[in-house]
Amino acid sequence: EDGGKVHFIVCDNRDEEQVKNMIAEVIEKFGKLDGLVNNAGGQFPSALESISANGFDAVVRNNLHSTFYLMREAYNQWMAKHGGSIVNMAADMWGGMPGMGHSGAARSGVDNLTKTASVEWGRSGVRVNCVAPGWIISSGMDNYSGDFAKFIIPSLAGNVPLKRMGTESEISSAICYLLSDAAAFVSGVTLRVDGAASQGTRMYPLADASNSHSFNGFHRAFIPDVLKDQIGKAEQQSAQAQDANKD
């Protein structure tokens, strides 16, 4: 039904030794390591003044340290001699990340780490890039509560020129491109997949978008509860607009 085969390895990506062992196991089992996607991460909403030292450290280790460990081991154990492609995950952190300052600090580090590695490891035929998702519909949104879930998440689409949020498939497509030979001369790039949200300005009000359609290639994808009402109405309006255009 889903196609392909997957091999699972349990690993705490914040633990250096576990990461070393995981990369070694992958190479032993498959005989090579062509590509690495650092897609593990996480954070929690909090004002800066309320973040404890442990909380800040946990988010930075989960997003930045783990990325470094995996990049380094993939390079040292395989890619230094054979080449390869690495894709890291950041976020739209260029304008700051109010309410998630710990995550913004870590993601900014990932962006710079990507650029540094692309220069240092280019001699080995290793391309290193990064994807910076904007506001993406995912099950993780249901992990938030309070005002963040009630007011902030439902308001996000209104701040995107395409007037919608992205899908997980649209992020995966960007990752697949950067991993592929089609991007053989692309390295040191952080690709923003955000519907141009990062280019907006309050001086220019956004008009309604009538022809913005998403790509969703995951048959198991589902709408998080916090967005079901909003997305249901948007899909209905989109269908009505398409029917009107046909007429």
State where each predicted segment sits.
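C-terminal substrate-recognition "lid" of short-chain dehydrogenase/reductases
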Residues: 68, 164-193, 198
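A short, exposed helix-loop element centered on a Lys and neighboring polar residues
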Residues: 71-72, 115
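Substrate-binding pocket helix/loop in short-chain dehydrogenase/reductase
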Residues: 47-48, 52-60, 152, 156
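Catalytic loop of short-chain dehydrogenase/reductase
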Residues: 87-110, 114-123, 136, 197
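Short C-terminal tail/terminal secondary-structure segment
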Residues: 176, 187-247
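Short, small/polar-rich loop/turn modules that mediate ligand/substrate recognition or access, typified
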Residues: 37, 122, 127, 186-188
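Alpha-helical segment proximal to the catalytic Tyr-Lys
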Residues: 76, 119-120, 184
